[in-house]
Amino acid sequence: MNTIKKFGLSLLFIICLIIALPFQSCEPEVIDVTECDTCIVAYKPNIYIYPQNNIQLTVNLGFPLGGEIITSIPEYGTGWNVFVDTTGLIDNKYSFLFYESIQPDIWQNNYGWITKKSELESFFRKNMADYGFRGKEIDDFIDYWIPRLQNYSFYSIYPQTAKLIEFVIKLDFSKEPDNLLRLFYVIKGHNQLQDKLIEPTIDNFKREGYYTTEWGVILK
């Protein structure tokens, strides 16, 4: 009887181990960016913050799959601790929080748009507005990026939205916004016209309450 009981317990243990193994293998692998040949830089993400009331705020970035900040304004240190007024001005000086980071290249390239170099500005003005960006947010993007996207005749543009970005670069606030818009563009230049891409559905963003917007670019 004792032998049967011991056998049953051993069998139960083995079954539990077999069940547990697949779940353990689903844990994300954290990559050391200093030894990562496939990591890539996210250039110039700008974070705009619009509180309903003046607020003292801590903002933190995290890299669940591995990664690190390589530059920031104001200095990131162990996290931004900033004062933001109702106009979005940060520490009475900055219009946005700026950083650049390196992390694993797992960005999507299944859907997006192909655009001529000559039409880039009009494309981004409309596309960013469709996603929910406004005014200075769009102007800042245009002023910085259009002069830097002049080397190719055509550009493939792949949007990366909040769900995917959050998987790679987490953005946390001591007081969470009511609404958060995060959009990165993966941009790849070509000298020949490429096949048309599957265009994504663009969700409507509500600029209501206390909200935050962020854009950035990954060049390929």
Model-identified regions with their sequence ranges:
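Bacterial N-terminal signal peptides
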Residues: 11-20
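C-terminal motif of bacterial Sec signal peptides marking the signal peptidase cleavage site
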Residues: 22-25
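Bacterial N-terminal signal peptides that target proteins for export
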Residues: 2-12
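Protease-labile, long low-complexity intrinsically disordered regions enriched in Pro/Ser/Thr
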Residues: 27-220
